[in-house]
């Protein structure tokens, strides 16, 4: 393919658990399979305490850079990651990532405890390791000349997650200032994650900075259905996953409001995207009732979307490839290769 991406700046170890609802013996127990069941258990406890037993499911790498970068790399994209993967050497959980991607590590990773259900997941993150990442730290780790070369070579630059990065704006502005004006189109890719964690004023400031730079560096913002609903509401629109309610037109309306080149929404049932260069597109996905793995699903969609874009595919094709990537991932708990998607 020959196209290159650089992803920065986070790094998580995901400790993934299931929650036991009842146990009759050592080997016989039932799990909470629906988030509503677990919520009911918590709510029914009232003002008292609640004791729960958790069952380890896996320990895995996580975060914007590792998940999206590795997903894209598995699909043939030349990928560089800058984040926190281990102080002296990558944590063993990132071994397969470092074998496929070029990795620069700023320190030890953050930790997320993930509680998986059939219909979703709860993520609880300890953020200390990623909250102090800043531009100077990145340049000091990579080296100024090497960092400038990385940016020059990149076709897509991803920064995330916005909601977990106090220095997002500073890093973004420094990257923009460092990019050469050589006629090559370089695209930014963002996944803000759950931006309800930060106030609306912070969101407005960051979006305004992205909008101001969009004419020089086209931007793609990807959100899930819950993030889309919050973003739509902030512009007085009701988000609906019913294709009969002109979801494509609504996506285009929001894209114009935020002033970015491309706006993508992904959900378990469909994906939709609006672009300044193409007509809005919609792609249904095959719903998976009992996914094997959900943590990292949205990132796998994004990795598939990035790979499809770098292959020169049209907007609808990009959505279909991204849907195929995440569909394979949640059913097999494996990031797909191109061969898996054929």
Residue ranges, per PLM feature:
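Alpha-helical scaffold segments in soluble metabolic enzymes
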Residues: 71-74, 230, 253, 304
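Ribokinase/PfkB-type carbohydrate-kinase core domain
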Residues: 1-42, 57-60, 64, 78-80, ...
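Short, conserved phosphate/pyrophosphate- and ester-handling motifs at nucleotide-, phospho-/glycolipid
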Residues: 72, 224, 298
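Alpha-helix C-terminal capping segments
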Residues: 66-78, 307-311
């Amino acid at each position: 393919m020959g196209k290159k991406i650089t992803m920065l700046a986070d790094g998580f170890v995901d400790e993934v658990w299931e929650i036991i609802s009842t146990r009759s013996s050592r080997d016989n127990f039932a799990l909470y399979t629906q988030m509503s069941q677990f919520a009911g258990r918590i709510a029914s406890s009232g003002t008292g305490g609640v004791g729960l037993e958790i069952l380890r499911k896996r320990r895995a790498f996580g975060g914007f850079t590792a998940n999206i970068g590795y997903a894209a790399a598995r699909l043939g994209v030349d990928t560089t990651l800058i984040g926190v993967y281990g102080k002296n050497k990558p944590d063993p959980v990132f071994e397969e990532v470092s074998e496929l991607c070029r990795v620069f590590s700023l320190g030890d990773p953050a930790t997320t405890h993930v509680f998986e259900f059939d219909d979703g997941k709860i993520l609880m993150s300890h953020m200390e390791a990623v909250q102090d990442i800043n531009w100077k730290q990145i340049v000091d780790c990579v080296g100024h000349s090497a960092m400038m070369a990385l940016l020059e070579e990149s076709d897509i630059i991803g920064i995330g997650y916005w909601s977990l990065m106090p220095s997002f704006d500073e890093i973004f502005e420094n990257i923009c200032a460092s990019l050469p004006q050589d006629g090559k189109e370089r695209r930014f890719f963002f996944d803000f994650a759950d931006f309800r964690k930060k106030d609306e004023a912070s969101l407005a400031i960051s979006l305004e900075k992205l909008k101001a730079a969009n004419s020089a560096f086209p931007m793609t913002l990807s959100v899930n259905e819950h993030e889309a609903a919050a973003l739509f509401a902030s512009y007085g629109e009701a988000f609906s996953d019913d294709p009969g309610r002109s979801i494509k037109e609504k996506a285009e309306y929001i894209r114009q409001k935020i002033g970015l080149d491309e706006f993508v929404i992904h959900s378990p049932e469909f994906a939709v995207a609006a672009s300044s260069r193409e007509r809005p597109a919609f792609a249904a996905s095959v719903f998976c009732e009992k996914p094997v793995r959900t943590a990292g699903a949205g990132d796998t969609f994004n990795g598939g979307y990035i790979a499809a874009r770098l292959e020169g595919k049209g907007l609808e094709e990009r959505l279909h490839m991204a849907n195929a990537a995440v569909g394979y991932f949640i059913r097999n708990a494996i990031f797909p290769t191109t061969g898996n998607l054929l």
